[in-house]
């Protein structure tokens, strides 16, 4: 299997979520299923079916997290420098609107655009890889091409 690049923070967050699921949520849902079973006929027991559905989701998420953690290749951005690569925090200026944006390039498993965590496989990240401060990049989006100037690169 292919390794999944991940920052130390991303791995820590995944381990935290896994611990929460295994030590708190899984036991709680097992208890809820047992209580719902006590209510009798399972064929029309909405509480039971709801709890089983939630259990299925929790077990699926646990498997997903365990898989990602086992394939994690932790890359500490603090040890990197130079042109943009995985782990870089990049300050950009939208050439059209002059709006400033800051993104950290991370792996798929920890990407969250709302938090400024940009998936390394995204079109913008792919355009930024290998570039340096002062360079401009153009990214094709569903709304048309967008240009960005790279103002600052840091590895924190």
Curated annotation (Swiss-Prot):
GO terms for biological process: DNA-templated transcription elongation; regulation of DNA-templated transcription elongation. The keyword Cytoplasm does not apply. Residues 45-66 form a coiled coil. InterPro entries: GreA/GreB_C_sf, TF_GreA/GreB_CS, Tscrpt_elong_fac_GreA, Tscrpt_elong_fac_GreA/B, Tscrpt_elong_fac_GreA/B_C, Tscrpt_elong_fac_GreA/B_fam, Tscrpt_elong_fac_GreA/B_N, Tscrpt_elong_fac_GreA/B_N_sf. Transmembrane segments: none annotated. Keywords: Coiled coil, DNA-binding, Transcription, Transcription regulation. It holds the Pfam family GreA_GreB. HAMAP family: GreA_GreB. Necessary for efficient RNA polymerase transcription elongation past template-encoded arresting sites. The arresting sites in DNA have the property of trapping a certain fraction of elongating RNA polymerases that pass through, resulting in locked ternary complexes. Cleavage of the nascent transcript by cleavage factors such as GreA or GreB allows the resumption of elongation from the new 3'terminus. GreA releases sequences of 2 to 3 nucleotides. This is Transcription elongation factor GreA. It comes from Jannaschia sp. (strain CCS1). The lineage of its organism: Bacteria, Pseudomonadati, Pseudomonadota, Alphaproteobacteria, Rhodobacterales. The gene is greA.
